[in-house]
Protein backbone atom coordinates (compact mmCIF):
# COMPACT_ATOMS: atom_id res chain seq x y z
CA UNK A 1 0.00 0.00 0.00
CA UNK A 2 2.83 2.34 0.89
CA UNK A 3 4.47 1.57 -2.42
CA UNK A 4 1.22 2.41 -4.20
CA UNK A 5 0.89 5.69 -2.31
CA UNK A 6 4.46 6.61 -3.21
CA UNK A 7 3.67 5.91 -6.85
CA UNK A 8 0.53 8.09 -6.67
CA UNK A 9 2.58 10.81 -5.02
CA UNK A 10 5.17 10.68 -7.77
CA UNK A 11 2.43 10.83 -10.41
CA UNK A 12 0.81 13.81 -8.71
CA UNK A 13 4.15 15.61 -8.57
CA UNK A 14 4.65 14.89 -12.25
CA UNK A 15 1.21 16.26 -13.08
CA UNK A 16 1.83 19.37 -10.98
CA UNK A 17 5.18 19.89 -12.69
CA UNK A 18 3.61 19.59 -16.13
CA UNK A 19 0.67 21.83 -15.22
CA UNK A 20 3.01 24.36 -13.68
CA UNK A 21 5.14 24.41 -16.79
CA UNK A 22 2.27 24.77 -19.24
CA UNK A 23 1.59 28.50 -18.76
CA UNK A 24 5.26 29.43 -19.25
CA UNK A 25 5.39 27.36 -22.42
CA UNK A 26 2.21 29.00 -23.66
CA UNK A 27 3.38 32.48 -22.70
CA UNK A 28 6.07 32.89 -25.31
CA UNK A 29 6.44 33.00 -29.05
CA UNK A 30 3.19 34.83 -29.78
CA UNK A 31 3.07 35.98 -33.40
CA UNK A 32 2.12 39.65 -33.80
CA UNK A 33 1.58 41.29 -37.19
CA UNK A 34 2.39 45.02 -37.08
CA UNK A 35 0.97 47.36 -39.73
CA UNK A 36 2.38 50.86 -40.29
CA UNK A 37 1.67 53.42 -43.00
CA UNK A 38 4.92 53.89 -44.92
CA UNK A 39 8.69 53.54 -45.02
CA UNK A 40 9.36 57.23 -45.74
CA UNK A 41 8.39 58.79 -42.40
CA UNK A 42 11.03 58.34 -39.65
CA UNK A 43 8.22 58.32 -37.09
CA UNK A 44 6.94 54.96 -38.29
CA UNK A 45 10.44 53.53 -38.24
CA UNK A 46 10.52 54.50 -34.56
CA UNK A 47 7.18 52.72 -34.05
CA UNK A 48 8.54 49.57 -35.70
CA UNK A 49 11.70 49.64 -33.59
CA UNK A 50 9.61 50.04 -30.45
CA UNK A 51 7.52 47.06 -31.50
CA UNK A 52 10.68 45.00 -32.07
CA UNK A 53 12.06 45.96 -28.66
CA UNK A 54 8.82 44.97 -26.91
CA UNK A 55 8.71 41.65 -28.74
CA UNK A 56 12.29 40.90 -27.71
CA UNK A 57 11.53 41.74 -24.09
CA UNK A 58 8.43 39.51 -24.05
CA UNK A 59 9.84 36.68 -26.19
CA UNK A 60 7.19 37.27 -28.86
CA UNK A 61 7.62 37.40 -32.63
CA UNK A 62 6.82 40.48 -34.72
CA UNK A 63 6.35 40.65 -38.48
CA UNK A 64 6.05 44.08 -40.11
CA UNK A 65 3.72 44.98 -42.96
CA UNK A 66 4.35 48.31 -44.70
CA UNK A 67 2.96 49.45 -48.07
CA UNK A 68 5.72 49.88 -50.67
CA UNK A 69 3.81 52.93 -51.92
CA UNK A 70 3.41 55.33 -48.99
CA UNK A 71 -0.07 55.29 -47.42
CA UNK A 72 -1.51 53.02 -50.14
CA UNK A 73 -5.07 51.99 -49.28
CA UNK A 74 -5.30 49.10 -51.81
CA UNK A 75 -1.92 47.73 -50.77
CA UNK A 76 -2.67 47.79 -47.05
CA UNK A 77 -6.03 46.16 -47.71
CA UNK A 78 -4.28 43.39 -49.64
CA UNK A 79 -1.73 42.97 -46.84
CA UNK A 80 -4.51 42.63 -44.27
CA UNK A 81 -6.21 39.94 -46.35
CA UNK A 82 -2.92 38.03 -46.68
CA UNK A 83 -2.22 38.26 -42.95
CA UNK A 84 -5.67 37.02 -41.99
CA UNK A 85 -4.96 33.83 -43.95
CA UNK A 86 -1.72 33.39 -41.94
CA UNK A 87 -3.70 33.72 -38.67
CA UNK A 88 -1.28 35.55 -36.37
CA UNK A 89 -2.07 35.56 -32.66
CA UNK A 90 -2.63 39.33 -32.67
CA UNK A 91 -2.42 42.39 -34.90
CA UNK A 92 -1.13 45.90 -34.16
CA UNK A 93 -2.74 48.19 -36.70
CA UNK A 94 -2.15 51.72 -37.96
CA UNK A 95 -4.66 52.39 -40.76
CA UNK A 96 -3.27 54.29 -43.74
CA UNK A 97 -6.66 56.03 -43.81
CA UNK A 98 -8.86 56.07 -40.72
CA UNK A 99 -12.09 55.74 -42.73
CA UNK A 100 -11.06 53.83 -45.84
CA UNK A 101 -9.52 51.00 -43.81
CA UNK A 102 -12.62 50.33 -41.70
CA UNK A 103 -13.54 47.36 -43.96
CA UNK A 104 -10.09 45.90 -43.26
CA UNK A 105 -10.69 46.22 -39.52
CA UNK A 106 -14.06 44.52 -40.00
CA UNK A 107 -12.29 41.60 -41.71
CA UNK A 108 -9.81 41.32 -38.83
CA UNK A 109 -12.67 41.38 -36.34
CA UNK A 110 -14.52 38.78 -38.39
CA UNK A 111 -11.47 36.51 -38.26
CA UNK A 112 -11.50 36.79 -34.44
CA UNK A 113 -7.92 38.07 -34.33
CA UNK A 114 -7.39 40.51 -31.44
CA UNK A 115 -6.20 43.88 -32.71
CA UNK A 116 -4.59 46.90 -31.04
CA UNK A 117 -5.14 50.23 -32.80
CA UNK A 118 -2.00 52.40 -32.74
CA UNK A 119 -1.20 56.01 -33.75
CA UNK A 120 -4.12 56.79 -36.10
CA UNK A 121 -7.46 56.07 -34.43
CA UNK A 122 -9.71 54.01 -36.69
CA UNK A 123 -13.16 55.42 -37.42
CA UNK A 124 -14.76 52.22 -36.13
CA UNK A 125 -14.06 48.63 -35.21
CA UNK A 126 -13.51 46.43 -32.16
CA UNK A 127 -10.09 46.81 -30.53
CA UNK A 128 -8.27 45.48 -27.50
CA UNK A 129 -6.98 49.02 -26.94
CA UNK A 130 -5.91 52.28 -28.54
CA UNK A 131 -2.32 53.48 -28.15
CA UNK A 132 -1.40 56.95 -29.36
CA UNK A 133 -1.37 60.65 -28.59
CA UNK A 134 -3.79 63.56 -28.96
CA UNK A 135 -3.01 65.14 -32.31
CA UNK A 136 -5.23 68.09 -31.46
CA UNK A 137 -3.33 68.81 -28.24
CA UNK A 138 0.02 68.40 -29.99
CA UNK A 139 -1.07 70.90 -32.64
CA UNK A 140 -2.36 73.28 -29.98
CA UNK A 141 0.70 73.17 -27.71
CA UNK A 142 3.25 73.23 -30.54
CA UNK A 143 1.32 76.07 -32.18
CA UNK A 144 1.22 78.03 -28.94
CA UNK A 145 4.96 77.53 -28.52
CA UNK A 146 5.65 78.84 -32.03
CA UNK A 147 3.37 81.85 -31.61
CA UNK A 148 4.97 82.75 -28.28
CA UNK A 149 8.42 82.57 -29.89
CA UNK A 150 7.11 84.87 -32.65
CA UNK A 151 6.17 87.40 -29.98
CA UNK A 152 2.48 86.87 -30.67
CA UNK A 153 2.64 88.59 -34.04
CA UNK A 154 3.78 88.04 -37.61
CA UNK A 155 3.05 86.01 -40.73
CA UNK A 156 2.50 82.28 -40.43
CA UNK A 157 2.19 79.46 -42.99
CA UNK A 158 1.02 75.89 -42.38
CA UNK A 159 2.19 72.70 -44.05
CA UNK A 160 -0.62 70.18 -43.66
CA UNK A 161 -0.27 66.40 -43.88
CA UNK A 162 -2.18 64.07 -46.18
CA UNK A 163 -5.54 65.54 -47.12
CA UNK A 164 -8.26 63.78 -45.13
CA UNK A 165 -5.82 62.15 -42.69
CA UNK A 166 -7.17 62.47 -39.16
CA UNK A 167 -3.72 63.22 -37.74
CA UNK A 168 -3.37 66.19 -40.06
CA UNK A 169 -6.93 67.38 -39.50
CA UNK A 170 -6.52 67.36 -35.72
CA UNK A 171 -3.03 68.86 -35.66
CA UNK A 172 -4.06 71.74 -37.91
CA UNK A 173 -7.24 72.18 -35.87
CA UNK A 174 -5.09 72.56 -32.76
CA UNK A 175 -2.84 75.08 -34.52
CA UNK A 176 -5.85 77.08 -35.69
CA UNK A 177 -7.11 77.24 -32.12
CA UNK A 178 -3.73 78.64 -31.05
CA UNK A 179 -3.94 81.23 -33.85
CA UNK A 180 -7.37 82.34 -32.60
CA UNK A 181 -5.76 83.12 -29.26
CA UNK A 182 -3.25 85.46 -30.94
CA UNK A 183 -4.86 88.34 -32.89
CA UNK A 184 -1.42 89.57 -33.96
CA UNK A 185 -0.81 86.43 -36.04
CA UNK A 186 -1.72 86.50 -39.73
CA UNK A 187 -2.25 83.07 -41.29
CA UNK A 188 -1.02 83.51 -44.86
CA UNK A 189 -1.62 80.01 -46.22
CA UNK A 190 -2.33 76.41 -45.22
CA UNK A 191 -1.37 73.83 -47.86
CA UNK A 192 -0.74 70.05 -47.86
CA UNK A 193 2.77 68.66 -48.03
CA UNK A 194 1.45 65.11 -47.61
CA UNK A 195 3.84 64.40 -44.74
CA UNK A 196 6.68 64.13 -47.28
CA UNK A 197 9.92 66.11 -47.08
CA UNK A 198 10.34 66.73 -50.82
CA UNK A 199 6.73 67.79 -51.33
CA UNK A 200 6.96 70.15 -48.36
CA UNK A 201 10.14 71.65 -49.80
CA UNK A 202 8.36 72.36 -53.08
CA UNK A 203 5.28 73.78 -51.35
CA UNK A 204 7.47 76.01 -49.19
CA UNK A 205 9.37 77.28 -52.23
CA UNK A 206 6.05 78.25 -53.83
CA UNK A 207 4.84 79.92 -50.64
CA UNK A 208 8.02 81.99 -50.42
CA UNK A 209 7.49 83.21 -53.98
CA UNK A 210 3.96 84.31 -53.08
CA UNK A 211 4.81 85.78 -49.69
CA UNK A 212 7.98 87.88 -49.31
CA UNK A 213 7.74 87.86 -45.51
CA UNK A 214 7.12 84.63 -43.59
CA UNK A 215 7.95 84.68 -39.88
CA UNK A 216 6.79 81.25 -38.78
CA UNK A 217 6.17 77.79 -40.26
CA UNK A 218 3.97 75.17 -38.64
CA UNK A 219 4.60 71.76 -40.21
CA UNK A 220 2.28 68.91 -39.26
CA UNK A 221 5.25 66.53 -39.05
CA UNK A 222 9.02 66.68 -38.75
CA UNK A 223 9.71 65.47 -42.29
CA UNK A 224 7.84 68.48 -43.70
CA UNK A 225 9.58 70.77 -41.23
CA UNK A 226 12.90 69.51 -42.62
CA UNK A 227 11.68 70.26 -46.15
CA UNK A 228 10.66 73.77 -45.11
CA UNK A 229 14.06 74.39 -43.52
CA UNK A 230 15.80 73.22 -46.69
CA UNK A 231 13.67 75.59 -48.78
CA UNK A 232 14.39 78.50 -46.45
CA UNK A 233 18.13 77.79 -46.53
CA UNK A 234 18.06 77.57 -50.32
CA UNK A 235 16.44 80.99 -50.54
CA UNK A 236 18.67 82.46 -47.81
CA UNK A 237 15.60 83.32 -45.75
CA UNK A 238 14.85 82.96 -42.06
CA UNK A 239 11.71 81.82 -40.24
CA UNK A 240 10.90 79.96 -37.05
CA UNK A 241 9.96 76.36 -37.88
CA UNK A 242 8.19 73.76 -35.75
CA UNK A 243 7.17 70.20 -36.53
CA UNK A 244 5.55 67.25 -34.78
CA UNK A 245 6.74 63.69 -34.05
CA UNK A 246 9.94 64.20 -32.05
CA UNK A 247 12.12 62.34 -34.56
CA UNK A 248 15.92 62.13 -34.29
CA UNK A 249 16.22 64.34 -37.39
CA UNK A 250 14.18 67.03 -35.65
CA UNK A 251 16.24 66.70 -32.46
CA UNK A 252 19.43 67.19 -34.48
CA UNK A 253 17.93 70.26 -36.21
CA UNK A 254 16.93 71.76 -32.86
CA UNK A 255 20.41 71.10 -31.49
CA UNK A 256 21.93 72.80 -34.55
CA UNK A 257 19.64 75.83 -34.17
CA UNK A 258 17.86 75.15 -37.48
CA UNK A 259 14.49 74.22 -35.96
CA UNK A 260 12.64 75.84 -33.08
CA UNK A 261 10.79 72.85 -31.62
CA UNK A 262 8.88 69.64 -32.25
CA UNK A 263 5.84 68.13 -30.58
CA UNK A 264 6.79 64.74 -29.13
CA UNK A 265 4.59 62.00 -30.63
CA UNK A 266 6.46 59.21 -28.80
CA UNK A 267 6.77 56.89 -31.79
CA UNK A 268 9.11 54.41 -30.11
CA UNK A 269 6.92 54.22 -27.02
CA UNK A 270 3.79 53.83 -29.13
CA UNK A 271 5.37 50.76 -30.72
CA UNK A 272 6.44 49.45 -27.31
CA UNK A 273 3.08 49.84 -25.66
CA UNK A 274 1.06 48.57 -28.62
CA UNK A 275 2.93 45.25 -28.80
CA UNK A 276 3.06 44.95 -25.01
CA UNK A 277 -0.70 45.45 -24.88
CA UNK A 278 -1.32 42.86 -27.59
CA UNK A 279 0.87 40.25 -25.92
CA UNK A 280 -0.43 40.93 -22.41
CA UNK A 281 -3.98 40.55 -23.68
CA UNK A 282 -3.09 37.17 -25.19
CA UNK A 283 -1.59 36.14 -21.85
CA UNK A 284 -4.75 37.22 -20.01
CA UNK A 285 -2.89 39.96 -18.14
CA UNK A 286 -4.46 43.36 -17.36
CA UNK A 287 -4.24 46.01 -20.07
CA UNK A 288 -5.43 49.58 -20.38
CA UNK A 289 -8.14 50.32 -22.92
CA UNK A 290 -6.67 53.75 -23.74
CA UNK A 291 -2.99 54.70 -23.61
CA UNK A 292 -2.66 58.33 -24.69
CA UNK A 293 0.69 60.05 -24.30
CA UNK A 294 0.71 63.68 -23.08
CA UNK A 295 1.38 66.56 -25.47
CA UNK A 296 4.91 67.78 -24.78
CA UNK A 297 7.15 70.11 -26.75
CA UNK A 298 10.84 69.37 -27.32
CA UNK A 299 13.07 72.44 -27.70
CA UNK A 300 16.65 73.54 -27.03
CA UNK A 301 16.12 73.23 -23.26
CA UNK A 302 15.15 69.56 -23.19
CA UNK A 303 16.19 67.95 -26.49
CA UNK A 304 18.77 65.80 -24.67
CA UNK A 305 16.03 63.34 -23.71
CA UNK A 306 15.58 62.43 -27.36
CA UNK A 307 19.22 62.30 -28.43
CA UNK A 308 19.59 58.54 -27.95
CA UNK A 309 19.07 56.96 -31.40
CA UNK A 310 15.88 54.89 -31.55
CA UNK A 311 17.98 51.93 -32.69
CA UNK A 312 19.71 52.00 -29.29
CA UNK A 313 16.60 52.32 -27.12
CA UNK A 314 14.82 49.61 -25.16
CA UNK A 315 11.21 49.48 -24.04
CA UNK A 316 10.62 49.97 -20.32
CA UNK A 317 8.89 47.31 -18.28
CA UNK A 318 5.09 47.50 -18.46
CA UNK A 319 4.79 48.45 -14.79
CA UNK A 320 7.18 51.38 -15.24
CA UNK A 321 5.62 52.52 -18.52
CA UNK A 322 2.06 52.74 -17.22
CA UNK A 323 3.21 54.88 -14.28
CA UNK A 324 4.40 57.69 -16.58
Positions of PLM-derived features:
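A residue-level marker of the well-folded mature domains of exported/periplasmic proteins
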Residues: 3-4, 25-324
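Bacterial N-terminal signal peptides that target proteins for export
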Residues: 2-12
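N-terminal signal peptide c-region/cleavage motif recognized by signal peptidases
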Residues: 21-23
Amino acid sequence: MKANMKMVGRCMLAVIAVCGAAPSLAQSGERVAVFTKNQTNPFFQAVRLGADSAAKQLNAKVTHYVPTKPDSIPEQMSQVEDVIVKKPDAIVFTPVDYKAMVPAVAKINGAKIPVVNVTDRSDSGSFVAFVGASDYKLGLETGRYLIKAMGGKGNLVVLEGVKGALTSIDRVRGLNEAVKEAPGIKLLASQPGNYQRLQALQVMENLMQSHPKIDGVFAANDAMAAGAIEALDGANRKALVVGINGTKEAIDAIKAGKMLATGDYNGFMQGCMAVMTAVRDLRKLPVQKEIVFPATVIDKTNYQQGETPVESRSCPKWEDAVKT
